Amino acid sequence: MALMSKAAIVTGAAQGIGKAIAARLVKDGMRVAIVDVNQEAAVAAAEELAGQYGADTMAVQCDVSQEEQVNIAVQKVLERFGTVDVLVNNAGILSLKKPFVEYTKADWDKIFGINFMGDVFFCKALIPTMKEKKSGRIINMASQSAETGGLAASPIYAASKAAVWCMTKSLAGEMGPYQVTVNAVAPGYIMTEMTRNAGYRDDMVPMKRLGTPEDVADVVGFLASEDSRYVTGMIVDINGGTVMR
């Protein structure tokens, strides 16, 4: 899976699944931009990966729900790396659990702004470059919640990930003629700092263990590679068997 000299953007990459994805890509020889709303954490992650793997990394602060910030972030990466071959839209947040009728429009706007519109903004910013090169990989972060509705009292999160799911398939058809693949991964119960208090248990999974960020990162590594050149429009389940289709 030679990715030497290629460059990637990974959003929400300062910790958890995003950081594991960034680590996988730098281990494969990629230059990686760590994009995160937390500047200090992004710098720390970029420096850690550079020191550990001798990688060419950079940290970019960005609130993915703000289109202007996304455009500025993409421009910074293009100025530094000269290209972006792989976009991993990983940034996301969970929704608070409460009765459906108690969710406000602000709640819906916040979750959709980060979990869905962030993907839209980064795709819009990078698609022209990828179309011109007739090459590229776009990998979005869906969730098994898009299929199951998620755990009780989390409708906004599930709906936002269902939107990512559908956009991925639609965009794959549009980008096919340009040799740009568009796929998504749909993690199940993955243990991260963000999900630590979500109530996940080993006995919820047929394989009797919770997933790790590396379980997700290794699949993303494949989708980012030349080995996946004829794979597009796919939602890849990473859930230990909790959802089978």
Where would I find each of the regions flagged by the language model?
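Active-site loop-to-helix junction immediately N-terminal to the catalytic Tyr of the SDR YXXXK motif
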Residues: 103, 149-158, 170
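Substrate-binding pocket helix/loop in short-chain dehydrogenase/reductase
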Residues: 98-100, 107-112, 201-202
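Short, small/polar-rich loop/turn modules that mediate ligand/substrate recognition or access, typified
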Residues: 83, 176, 181, 231-233, ...
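Residue(s) in the substrate-gating loop at a strand-loop-helix junction
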Residues: 143
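Active-site helix of classical SDR
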Residues: 123, 160, 168
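Alpha-helical segment proximal to the catalytic Tyr-Lys
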Residues: 128, 173-177, 229
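Short C-terminal tail/terminal secondary-structure segment
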Residues: 2, 94-97, 148, 221, ...
